[in-house]
Design a protein with these regions (language model features):
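Short amphipathic alpha-helical interface segments
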Residues: 2-70, 77-78, 93-102, 114-121
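Short, intrinsically disordered terminal segments enriched in charged and Pro/Gly residues
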Residues: 124-125
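Long, charge-rich, low-complexity alpha-helical segments
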Residues: 75-76, 86
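Minor-groove-contacting beta-hairpin "wing" of winged helix-turn-helix DNA-binding domains
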Residues: 82-90, 103-105
């Protein structure tokens, strides 16, 4: 059921952008750091995917995560790895339902978004 097709609209008639608060910035910073570590190590990005509970610890909410996925800033998958496997394994999903073993990575679009959001917060602070 999708009844929430309406968006908030500002006085100019433009769709209002969501507030990028400190919790979202902290989550983006953690996801971006994992992305950079994977690149630096020459590893598969998914080997550095972050478990959702670590993202919740930054103050991210389930709505934040759903928004990141819906905007295609983040990808997610259910981890199906076994102890001792040389690499982590995931069952990828595009949906907005997450299970306890869901992990997240930034997409290329998300890396760009995170860089801008974090740069803006540094310039403002």
């Amino acid at each position: 059921m999708t009844l929430n097709k309406r968006s908030e609209v500002d006085d100019s008639g433009e769709q209002a952008a969501p507030l990028i608060d400190a919790n979202l910035r902290a989550g983006l910073a953690l996801l971006r750091q994992a992305h950079l570590y994977a690149l630096d190590a020459g590893a598969d990005l998914w080997d550095f995917a972050l478990e959702h509970d670590h993202l919740y610890e930054t103050g991210l909410t389930i709505s934040d995560l759903r928004w990141l996925v819906a905007k295609k800033f983040a990808g997610h998958g259910q981890e199906i790895s076994f102890y001792g496997d040389p690499h982590r394994s995931f069952r990828l999903s595009d949906g907005l339902n997450f299970v306890p073993t869901t992990c997240f990575v930034l997409t290329p679009k998300g890396v760009e978004f995170a860089g801008k959001a974090l740069k803006e917060s540094t310039a403002a602070g």
